[in-house]
Amino acid sequence: MLKDLYKSHIVPSLKTKLGYSNVMQVPKIVKVCLNIGLGIRGSDSKVMNSCVRDLALIAGQKPVATYAKKSIAGFKIRKGFPIGCKVTLRNNKMYEFLERLIHVVLPREQDFKGLSVNQFDGCGNLSIGIKEHISFLEIDYDKIDKILGLDINIVTNAVNNNDAKLLLMEFGFPFIN
């Protein structure tokens, strides 16, 4: 499991690579946030229920519906409309999800060559977009109504992008360069 790998191999390796004197200075993954945005389709209760069901299957815990903060006429949404759902994973469920993401989902993604350094936000957090949520094995292709996209944000306590990239490479994330 990735949690055991982190404690036994990744922490000592990063401690020497980054030149830290204390184990607590080594960066770690704090949480993983999953989000499915539906936009105008969120007002359809059937689509919204399938979104919540699918995200619950992917994450292993119940997601929370997200609502529009303000009305935007160009997007045809009003304040309070449901526009998607999200879930935050921590601890054991986070590590289980990351293991499935690295070893199953990313290799199954179409035209996937690897993650880019440009996907970091400058503070050590990585954002990944999955075009088709059916890449997850938990989703039964026959039971879905629409193929949805999925946003994955991996939040670390790394000081900069380079430390976060080293951390994620130790976990086995495939980077292009």
Curated annotation (Swiss-Prot):
Nucleus as UniProt keyword: no
Any GO BP: translation
Top-level lineage group: Bacteria
PROSITE patterns named in the record: RIBOSOMAL_L5 (PS00358)
Key words of the record: Ribonucleoprotein, Ribosomal protein, RNA-binding, rRNA-binding, tRNA-binding
Keyword Chloroplast carried by entry: no
Any Pfam family the entry gives: Ribosomal_L5_C
GO MF, one annotated term: tRNA binding
Matching PANTHER family: 60S RIBOSOMAL PROTEIN L11-RELATED
Assembly and binders: Part of the 50S ribosomal subunit; part of the 5S rRNA/L5/L18/L25 subcomplex. Contacts the 5S rRNA and the P site tRNA. Forms a bridge to the 30S subunit in the 70S ribosome.
Family as reported in the entry's similarity comment: Belongs to the universal ribosomal protein uL5 family.
Name of the protein described by the UniProt record: Large ribosomal subunit protein uL5
Organism listed in the record: Ehrlichia canis (strain Jake)
